[in-house]
Amino acid sequence: MVLSGEDKSNIKAAWGKIGGHGAEYGAEALERMFASFPTTKTYFPHFDVSHGSAQVKGHGKKVADALASAAGHLDDLPGALSALSDLHAHKLRVDPVNFKLLSHCLLVTLASHHPADFTPAVHASLDKFLASVSTVLTSKYR
């Protein structure tokens, strides 16, 4: 999926507003995913997936950091996410559908925290960005 200049601008602006809340939003999105799609918990058998868990917060930070890195490398998502793609495809063997589920939960989380900024254009740009990230993360499954 090709990101337009407007998409890139919207993504960078949105990530700028997320600022120091990335880890918090990442954890909240994971909690939403676990609650809405309980089968996703099977990938975290060693985690305490309850609300406020230190393990969920830690993984939420990893998710947020990876997305922040991707947002900073919009012209080279495959390069920026190559190691993460290898990890999820070959070691963790995460079902690709789970990236879409987490993406949806991230969009809901961002919209709930920034309703005034979550315009239809920003929503579309972030959705395209997360779909592009998901595509890159699943590229090594083939």
UniProtKB/Swiss-Prot annotation:
Any one Gene Ontology cellular component term annotated for this protein: hemoglobin complex
Modified residues (Phosphoserine): S4, S36, S50, S103, S112, S125, S132, S139
Binding site for O2: H59
Tissue specificity as recorded in UniProt: Red blood cells.
CDD domains per UniProt: Hb-alpha-like
Positions of post-translational N6-succinyllysine modification: K8, K12, K17, K41
PTM annotation (N6-acetyllysine): residues: K17
Highest taxon of the lineage: Eukaryota
Pfam short name (any one): Globin
Residues reported in the UniProt entry to bind heme b: H88
Keyword Metal-binding attached: yes
Residue positions where Phosphotyrosine is found in the record: Y25
Alphabetically ordered keywords of this record: Acetylation, Heme, Iron, Metal-binding, Oxygen transport, Phosphoprotein, Transport
Keyword presence, Glycoprotein: no
InterPro entries: Globin, Globin-like_sf, Globin/Proto, Hemoglobin_a-typ, Hemoglobin_oxygen_transport, Hemoglobin_pi
One BP term from GO: erythrocyte development
Modification Phosphothreonine occurs at: T109, T135, T138
Function in brief: Involved in oxygen transport from the lung to the various peripheral tissues.
Family: Belongs to the globin family.
Subunit structure: Heterotetramer of two alpha chains and two beta chains.
Protein name (record): Hemoglobin subunit alpha
Lineage: Eukaryota, Metazoa, Chordata, Craniata, Vertebrata
